[in-house]
């Protein structure tokens, strides 16, 4: 048996030939797919050399078996099949996808990670190594992308960022690469999750004044994303106002 390989890995075998050229070799390939299907394919190779190359299939994950069903040369034909088989395993590439109903856009507060982490579903053989990038798209200041690798021992992971968002604006969180116990997937990753990072709601006084005249207005600066609802107490009475 040959060592297992990942899907789409180039692979071939060399068959030694004896006889008067040209020598013809009948080969039968049997594929047992991971879905339980059996596929049989026959082909004939011809060569005037002492060896002939046999391309081996790796396009579909599963177990492959090759048998030589018969040979013939310029003078003789041997229809007896070879009892020995060439066998090997083709592993599928791991896959990652966001769990169903995961919103394509979510929000997070400045200086914090997201309140509800999206769940990444993984297909393959654990453990998985997942490369994640959180990169700024449109921010209110300079921000560096965050890249990190996380090992997942199951098939689901609630994506937790290693550091909080430090700059408000729009960020994208994307899967760069997924690797399982056998293979690696660099392309065909799920679409990114867009994160709107906003300042936490707050009320800031623009001045340190403590005394005001009767009828004079007291101004405050609102932090966060409108509309704001502010509840305050003055002279023993509680009031609520909305500002847009």
Predicted regions located by residue number:
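Extracellular low-complexity Ser/Thr/Asn/Gly-rich intrinsically disordered segments
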Residues: 1-244
